[in-house]
A protein has these predicted regions:
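Canonical leucine-rich repeat
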Residues: 1, 22, 46-51, 70, ...
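Leucine-rich repeat
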Residues: 6-8, 27-31, 43, 54-58, ...
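Concave beta-strand-loop units of leucine-rich repeat
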Residues: 8, 13-18, 34-46, 56-67, ...
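A broadly tuned "polar low-complexity/structure-edge" signature
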Residues: 24-38
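Intrinsically disordered, low-complexity Ser/Thr- and Pro-rich stretches
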Residues: 123, 134, 138, 155-159, ...
């Protein structure tokens, strides 16, 4: 797919294809880019994506694209980022302070720093290898999926807007949800709790 001459493009949806490469360096007007699901079993995958020139991007969907790395440090306008089901060695979202939605699950992440992402409302970081997660700066969070990691503690006392919290399949021994009075869904199964206070 050659879109190098289509410099006026603002929206590009290539989801559910078999792309092995995509050059969007000339498409600086892009605000929406969807590359969901480029993986076909046994086939070559996309592996890399250069969006450093695409500073107008507000929406980037590249889940299950086969990426081994993703640099979004130049994409400061991003409000939506979904990069789950990739084999990323790491994810740096420290420059993406406008993010309200972040999905980076199933990505073999061992750490995730969201301290700069104070506008975050939804965070999906489940099924990684996280041993800690600090969401104390994310006071706008309404949805948190951090299940199936290796968390031994989780502090959600600052997240008073939380309505959905899934933290099962971790190694938690305690969890204080006394400040989370808006919670409607709470998943705690398969942890190491001996007592749970939901008073």
């Amino acid at each position: 797919l050659d879109v190098s001459s289509n410099t006026a493009l603002t929206d590009l949806n290539c989801s559910f294809n078999q792309l092995t490469s995509l050059d969007v360096t000339n498409n600086t007007a892009l605000t929406y880019l969807n590359l969901l699901d480029q993986r076909i079993q046994g086939a070559e995958t996309l592996t890399s994506l250069d969006v450093t020139n695409n500073t107008a991007l507000t929406y980037l969907q590249c889940a299950n694209a086969g990426l081994t790395s993703l640099d979004v440090s130049s994409n400061t306008a991003l409000t939506y980022l979904s990069c789950s089901i990739n084999s990323s060695a790491g994810l740096d979202v420290s420059n993406n302070t406008a993010l309200t939605y972040l999905a980076c699950s199933y990505s073999q992440l061992t750490s995730l720093d969201v301290s700069a992402n104070t506008a975050l409302e939804e965070l999906y970081c489940h099924q990684n290898q996280l041993t800690s997660l600090d969401v104390s700066s994310n006071t706008s969070l309404t949805t948190l999926y951090c299940l199936e990691n290796q968390l031994t503690s989780l502090d959600v006392s600052a997240n008073t807007s939380l309505t959905t919290l899934y933290c099962h399949n971790n190694s938690l021994t305690s969890l204080d949800v006394s400040n989370n009075t808006a919670l409607t869904i709470l998943g705690l199964n398969y942890n190491q709790f001996t007592t749970i206070d939901v008073s």
